[in-house]
């Protein structure tokens, strides 16, 4: 089945949903031929929107089809024997299942990442980038533009890492659930434009006789709007089944209002530098790899255990600060990185990736941050110790 998006002549291909490893030679060859055939069969399409590339984020269900574990940044589903063999040949040491299982925590973003896991992530980003570039080159060769959907099978294409610059992507579109998820899209550099897919999706769970799509649309727009004033996306859109939306004329009226507001905001903000009171650095073990995604477990969905931490990042998304994301290794490599920072924010449960754990036992780190504070810098930290149970 071919599903057009709501904007322009962008289309995506969705055959029966089966999982295959595009990294292997035969499936790789098949995928490239399939891409060329799709372009040839649809000459009227001018933008191909790839619903990302190759590897789904970690999502585990139990035998009753209940969602039991999710990590929107998780690499656990990107493992295969073929990939692991390549990894071992490159890094020179054998891969162990524990590098992924991680004592049952599956390397969620709260775990201080091991060297081996970071090696695996870097390897995946490099290999994913090679094939993405091949696909975008085919797209451009055929006179089309390539757009990436930020989500779903997006592991290895993190937009703030060096590998992303090599992908050849023309544009990025992603779902907008709040200010943080908007900045996750709008802060991307090196693309011609960015687009936010606003909520709600035109699906039966909201568009039914008991649903209130206007209420959900208002909440979504007001939540995301403040971040647009700091760093705007270039376009907005919605997604789903148009026939459902047509049954709610008051919703269509509100969408028209949202579009008009967006045009006004964009006309005033695009190309300008908003006023910044200070420069803030969010410090954790991930740095720019998790920029605007700190404490983000399942995109913008509320999580009881971390909503206070996620709320800090959400607040920053629309606050008058120049926000950067750094990790401890950045400071270790270059302590001068702190010279133009006014405030460091380091918040999370104790001994997690968001506070640093054993990184605070590194003398050079302690020296750099103490010197930063001595010279007038500020640091905001929040360490919560949780019981083993």
Residue ranges and their predicted role:
Residues 1, 5, 54-106:
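Aromatic- and acidic-residue-enriched segments that line the glycan-binding/catalytic groove
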Residues 1, 9-40, 216-217:
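N-terminal accessory beta-strand-rich subdomains and adjacent acidic, glycine-rich linkers
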Residues 2-8, 385-389:
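Single conserved hydrophobic/aromatic residue that forms the stacking wall/gate
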Residues 13-28, 113-128, 168-174, 206-214, ...:
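The substrate-binding groove and active-site-proximal loops of carbohydrate-active enzymes
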Residues 28-69, 278-283, 373, 378-380:
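Hydrophobic, aliphatic-enriched repeat segments that assemble into extended interaction scaffolds
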Residues 36, 46-52, 58-60, 110-111, ...:
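Hydrophobic targeting/anchoring helices
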Residues 43-47, 142-146, 232-233, 319-322, ...:
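Loop/turn elements at helix/coil->beta-strand transitions in domains of secreted/extracellular proteins
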Residues 301-387:
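Helical hinge/lid and interdomain linker segments adjacent to catalytic or ligand-binding clefts
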């Amino acid at each position: 089945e071919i599903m057009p998006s709501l904007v322009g002549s962008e289309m995506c291909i969705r055959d029966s949903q089966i999982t295959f490893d595009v990294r292997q030679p035969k499936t790789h060859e098949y995928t490239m031929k399939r891409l060329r055939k799709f372009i040839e069969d649809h000459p009227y399409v001018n933008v191909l929107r790839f619903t990302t590339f190759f590897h789904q984020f970690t999502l585990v269900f139990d035998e009753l089809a209940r969602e039991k574990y999710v990590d929107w940044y998780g690499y656990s589903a990107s493992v295969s024997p073929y990939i692991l063999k390549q990894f071992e040949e490159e890094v020179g040491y054998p891969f162990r299942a524990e590098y992924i299982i991680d004592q049952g925590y599956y390397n969620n973003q709260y775990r201080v990442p091991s060297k081996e896991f970071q090696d695996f992530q870097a390897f995946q980003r490099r290999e994913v980038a090679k094939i993405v570039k091949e696909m975008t080159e085919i797209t451009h060769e055929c006179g089309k533009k390539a757009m990436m959907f930020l989500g779903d099978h997006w592991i290895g294409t993190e937009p703030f890492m060096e590998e992303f610059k090599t992908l050849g992507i023309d544009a990025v579109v992603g779902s907008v659930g709040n200010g943080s998820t908007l900045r996750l899209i709008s802060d991307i550099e090196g693309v011609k434009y960015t687009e936010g897919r606003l909520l709600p999706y035109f699906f039966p769970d909201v568009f039914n006789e008991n649903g209130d799509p206007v209420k959900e649309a208002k909440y979504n727009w007001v939540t995301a709007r403040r971040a647009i004033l700091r760093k705007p996306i270039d376009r907005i859109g919605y997604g789903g089944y148009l026939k459902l939306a047509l049954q709610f004329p008051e919703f269509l009226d509100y969408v028209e209002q949202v579009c008009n507001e967006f045009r006004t905001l964009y006309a005033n903000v695009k190309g300008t530098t908003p006023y910044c009171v200070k420069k803030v650095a969010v410090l954790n073990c991930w740095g720019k790899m998790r920029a605007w995604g700190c404490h983000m477990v399942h995109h913008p969905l509320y999580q009881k255990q971390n909503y206070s931490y996620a709320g800090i990042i959400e607040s920053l998304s629309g606050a008058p600060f120049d926000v950067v994301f750094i990790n401890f290794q950045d400071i270790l490599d270059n302590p001068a990185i702190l010279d133009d920072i006014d405030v460091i924010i380091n918040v999370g449960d104790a001994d997690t990736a968001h506070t640093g754990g054993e990184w605070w036992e590194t003398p050079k780190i302690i020296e750099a941050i103490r010197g930063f504070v001595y010279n007038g810098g500020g640091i905001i930290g929040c360490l919560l110790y949780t019981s083993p149970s």
